[in-house]
UniProtKB/Swiss-Prot annotation:
The chain crosses the membrane at residues 35-55, 152-172, 181-201, 205-225, 242-264, 282-302. Its main location: membrane. One of its GO terms (cellular component) is plasma membrane. It is found in: Cell membrane. It comes from Thermococcus gammatolerans (strain DSM 15229 / JCM 11827 / EJ3). HAMAP family: SecF_A (MF_01464_A). The lineage of its organism: Archaea, Methanobacteriati, Methanobacteriota, Thermococci, Thermococcales. The keyword Nucleotide-binding does not apply. Involved in protein export. Gene3D superfamilies: Multidrug efflux transporter AcrB transmembrane domain. The gene is secF. Part of the protein translocation apparatus. Forms a complex with SecD. SUPFAM superfamilies: Multidrug efflux transporter AcrB transmembrane domain. Belongs to the SecD/SecF family. SecF subfamily. Pfam families: SecD_SecF_C. This is Protein-export membrane protein SecF.
Length: 315
């Protein structure tokens, strides 16, 4: 009598991986053409939004006056109306909470003009005149220094992109995968900037730093996907894709979760701006990496173009 073969019991980790792959199988069923088309449409819409409504520059990039006020029994709108009525200066006010002391206060922003120091004194004196117990601290950012910071921020983004492009191309040595990764990073930044414009988040040195961090996050996930597909150990492209997606989704969702918690507990305007930019940038990266880049790579691997490039490289 023949002995029956014993069924190998699946490990819990294998079962979890199999469940993930079933949930993400809808991505495999998408046509490569549609995977490329949908993110391109989103990118074009974001580019149009940027053309119409680019994020406003913050005080640290365009210069101006920031007056921080504590111990004032008034709302931001009431204080802004009073300052405008008293000085004739068009100001904007917002409430904040100091992360160190826990005290609540109001920040008043005034645009940069010919004499920012004089404007700061006028606003401070007007507040002290009505609110005797107010703790008023003015800060002046000269427009010249704002322009310098703006130029340095633009240079930092350009140099980061050039450095990233060189490293990616040297690593893969293929124009199509390398170009797709570079475009995905660019698209993430465009979508993040468009979101800033819609939500009214100002472009500051802090948000520029967030955009630079976004380049690193984008390249990580795209290199993971591209490496898995081009140098795959699995039997099929679909298996390699699902393996990369399950790993990449875990990486990105944990980062998104941490950023969301940071945004919830933060009382700093700077941290709030950074986290919002990164959250929307990473959401865009989900689409650009696992749909757009995957669609391009699936087409590229199946096309004769890859074979001709390999022949030229092998000569």
């Amino acid at each position: 009598m023949g002995t029956k073969k014993q069924k190998t019991k699946k490990k819990p980790s294998d079962e979890i991986l199999e469940t993930k792959r079933k949930r993400l199988s809808f991505l495999v069923r998408m046509e490569p053409r549609k995977m490329v088309l949908y993110p391109l449409v989103v990118f074009l819409v974001a580019a149009l939004i940027l053309a119409v409504h680019f994020p406003e520059k913050g005080i640290d990039l365009k210069g101006g006056v920031v007056v921080t006020v504590y111990h004032v029994s008034a709302s931001p709108d009431e204080l802004a109306s009073y300052v405008k009525e008293k000085t004739g200066i068009d100001v904007r006010a917002e409430e904040f909470k100091d992360p160190i002391t826990g005290l609540s206060g109001i920040r008043i922003y005034a645009p940069a003009k010919t004499a920012p120091s004089k404007i700061a004194d006028e606003i401070s004196n007007a507040i002290r005149l009505k609110y005797k117990d107010a703790d008023v601290t003015p800060r002046v950012v000269d427009p010249t220094f704002g322009k310098i910071a703006q130029k340095q921020g633009i240079k930092a983004v350009i140099y980061a992109f050039i450095g990233m492009a060189i490293v990616v191309f040297l690593f893969f040595r293929d124009p199509v995968p390398s170009g797709t990764i570079i475009f995905s990073a660019f698209s993430d930044m465009v979508i993040a900037l468009a979101t800033m414009g819609i939500l009214g988040i100002e472009l500051t040195t802090a948000t520029i730093a967030a955009l630079l961090m976004l380049i690193g996050y984008t390249v990580d996930s795209n290199i993971l996907l591209t490496t898995r597909l081009l140098r795959r150990k699995e039997d099929t492209i679909e298996d390699a894709y699902l393996s990369a997606v399950s790993t990449g989704f875990t990486m990105s969702t944990t980062t998104l979760g941490a950023l969301f918690i940071l945004w919830l507990v933060s009382t700093s305007e700077v941290i709030d701006s950074i986290t919002i930019v990164l959250i929307f940038g990473l959401l865009a990266d989900f689409m650009n990496t696992w749909i757009f880049n995957a669609g391009v790579l699936r087409w590229y691997i199946a096309s004769p173009l890859k074979f001709s490039i390999k022949l030229r490289r092998g000569k």
